[in-house]
């Protein structure tokens, strides 16, 4: 098997795992499933490695490359763009190729051409067809929404909280989705994080945020603060506007907007393990020993794919426990990743 054949074999496996039906162009039937990936689909500039159809309409392309090209895979983004702007053979309906992937057997990058100043990012796997269909139905992308947040009303907030929130808004608007918020102990870190979550849900139009903690007590504290929070622009409490749930089992409800979980529970959920509340109880001694342990790996979970959460907020991100369960963060294809910790 050549390196390119090996890469395509693994790409096929990832597509199947992500809910796609794969077809050879000779057996073309783009309406066979919600999502159909067609190999070597002809365009007026040559055949694209994979054409992605959602509900019978072409919406994306995949450029498959051998593993050796992984480190330089961004250099083939021009190829993807060329195919995205090409004319697809046999297609009679109006269509737009909005999504592009470049993939090897080890690395996959993704671009949404509807993003302002779009750029590719690494993703754990391909998005599910239903996810792409949902993105197409939206009025705008989350990343575009985050560029146009209204001015923050800091009435009742401390200066350090106002600075943190405004700086975070600026970071997100500049297409920098990963941010670190460092605040002094007692400065209202969780309150600030909840304010950021509220703004991302209301103005960023996010569907779901994951609030990660490393102990049960921090999760309970965060839950209390979410339930009690009242924004300046609404008389209702946070929980009256958005659903909030602290996870206590292996089930994640899809109808809540904020899920609070320990990172060890989230690892178990993604790994398909049954859990109870005891998994959230980690002693100080265990936390201290985390640095000596090998990082834990997670695999694709069909029920909770990488795009399940639009943002991850990590509480006390400096702690050793995140070194061990770091792949829980890496697997998620999130539009925002906010780390918070107190400087003691």
Model-based region annotation:
Residues 214, 316, 341-342:
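Conserved H-loop
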Residues 216, 238-249, 263-268:
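Conserved helicase motor
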Residues 262, 315-316:
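Walker B catalytic acidic pair
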Residues 86, 298-305, 319-337:
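Short, conserved "post-DEAD/DEAH" coupling segment immediately C-terminal to helicase motif II
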Residues 157, 211, 314:
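Conserved SAM-binding loop
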Residues 1-208, 217-233, 254-258, 264, ...:
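ATP-dependent helicase/translocase motor core
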Residues 196, 246-247, 323-325:
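Short beta-alpha junctions and helix-cap segments that line functional grooves
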Residues 85-87, 91-92, 97-98, 238-242, ...:
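Phosphate/diphosphate-binding loops
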């Amino acid at each position: 098997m050549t390196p390119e054949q090996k890469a395509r074999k693994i790409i096929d496996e990832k597509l199947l795992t992500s809910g796609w039906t794969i077809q050879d162009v000779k057996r073309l039937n783009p309406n066979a499933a919600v999502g159909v990936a067609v190999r070597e689909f002809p365009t007026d500039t040559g055949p694209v490695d994979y054409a992605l159809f959602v509900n019978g309409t072409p919406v994306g392309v995949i450029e498959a490359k051998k593993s050796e090209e992984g480190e330089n895979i961004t250099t083939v983004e021009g190829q993807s763009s060329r195919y995205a702007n090409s004319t697809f053979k046999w297609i009679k309906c109006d269509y737009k190729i909005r999504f592009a992937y470049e993939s090897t057997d080890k690395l996959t990058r993704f671009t949404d051409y509807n993003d302002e100043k779009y750029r590719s990012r690494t993703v754990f796997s391909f998005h599910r067809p239903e996810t792409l269909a949902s993105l197409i139905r939206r009025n705008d992308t989350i990343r575009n929404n985050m560029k146009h947040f209204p001015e923050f009303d800091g009435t009742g907030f401390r200066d350090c909280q106002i600075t943190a929130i405004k700086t975070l808004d600026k970071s997100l608007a500049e297409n920098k989705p990963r941010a670190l918020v460092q605040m002094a102990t007692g400065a209202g870190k969780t309150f600030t994080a909840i304010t950021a979550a509220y703004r991302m849900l209301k103005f960023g139009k996010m569907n779901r945020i994951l609030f990660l903690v490393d102990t049960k007590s921090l999760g309970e504290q965060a839950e209390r603060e979410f339930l009690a929070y009242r924004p300046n622009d609404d008389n209702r409490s946070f929980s009256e506007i958005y659903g909030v749930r602290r996870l206590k089992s292996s089930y994640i409800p899809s109808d809540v907007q904020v899920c609070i979980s320990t990172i060890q529970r989230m690892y178990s959920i993604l790994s398909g393990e049954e859990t109870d509340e005891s998994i959230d109880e980690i002693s100080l001694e265990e936390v201290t020993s985390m640095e000596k342990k090998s990082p834990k790996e997670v695999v694709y979970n069909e029920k909770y794919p990488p795009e399940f959460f639009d943002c991850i907020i990590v509480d006390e991100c400096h702690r050793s426990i995140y070194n061990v369960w770091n792949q829980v963060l890496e697997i998620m294809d999130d539009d925002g990743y906010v780390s918070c910790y107190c400087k003691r």
